[in-house]
Structures are given as structure tokens and as C-alpha cells.
Amino acid sequence: SRYDATYINGIEMNDPTRGRFNYWSIGGLNRAFRNKTTILGMDATPFGFARIGSSTNINTLAADFAPGFNGSISYSNGAYMLRAMATYATGVNKHGWAFVGSISGRYAKEGIMPGSFYNALGLMLGAQKVFNPQHSLALTFYMAPMQSAGGSPTFKECYELADNYLYNPNWGWQD
């Protein structure tokens, strides 16, 4: 809500127009953006100004990821048909460097509704140089481009006339 603030590595990422965080901007990157700290209400936060609702900081610092590989492939019959994710983190090496990379893809030629497709990619890269326990320098890059088509709400009468509860009023001839 507009009473909440979402930060990524201590930088507020709420949309300045709507006042809300756009979760589609990190779509598919669940593993890369799962490390969070949430403060409820007006309590002091170590990462930004408190909000009436809550303040959440998403930590994508490479040194804070557990070293190793994590991957998954899943099939669904919903908005998308196939999803693949992979994340790899090096941990902090003897020179004080840590790296992390995450990629995901979601695809459907046609989702559960006729005329709906889904094509999304997510990519996150992070590097961090740890100088000592109190000082480090980090760079995080992420993107999540997406194309999709879906249905829209309609009246029960339309579903009954089409004799199909998956009727998509956005698909077909539009006169």
C-alpha cells in the first residue's frame, strides 16, 4: 500500500507516482530477492525512514548469499506453462570478492485462457568487494522484461452465452 516502503539494499524503490512498490519489476527472481527484513509500523529502521504501514529492505548483497547453485524447472497450467530458474553464488573468496547471478524464464504460447500468452525473463547480477567487516562496495544489476496477454473481467451472462467459463472477451473478432 502507499503506507509501506520497499527498499533494495537501502535504496527506496517505491514508484514516485503511485507510492507503491512494483513487484513486476523483480518478476521471476524469487531466489535473488528473497532475503528481506521487514519492520512494522513506525519503529526505527537501519535502512531508511519508517512508514506507518511497514518498511521492507530486500538484501541482494552478493556476500550475504549462501555459496552454491540452486535451480528448478516447473510446469503449470495457469498464466504460464513452463518456468525455469537458476541461481549461483560464489561466497566471499580469499581476496574479499563475492559474486552472485540469477536467471529465470517463464513461458506460455497460450495460457489457460484462449488468446493469452506469457513470455518473461528475469536476470540479476551482483558483485561485492568486502574490505573489512564494516566496509564493502557492492553493485547489483537486475531486469525483468515481460510480455503477456490475458483475459479481463466480464459478466456471468457472457460466460453463460459462450458456454465456457474460460471465455476471454479480449480474444477473437472485435467489431
Residue ranges with predicted function:
Residues 14-15, 43-46, 108:
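Short beta-strands and strand-coil junctions in structured, solvent-facing domains, enriched
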Residues 12-40, 59-61:
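Short acidic/polar hinge/loop motifs at secondary-structure boundaries
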Residues 33-38, 53-55, 59-77, 99-101:
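Transmembrane beta-strand segments of Gram-negative outer membrane beta-barrel proteins
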Residues 10-12, 62, 105, 143:
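A mature extracytoplasmic/lumenal domain signature
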Residues 1, 45-49, 61-65, 98-100, ...:
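Short acidic-glycine motifs
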Residues 151-174:
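Solvent-exposed loop segments that connect transmembrane elements
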Residues 1-12:
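Extracytoplasmic beta-strand/coil segments of soluble accessory domains associated
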Residues 70, 75-108, 112-152, 171:
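Transmembrane beta-barrel wall of Gram-negative outer-membrane proteins
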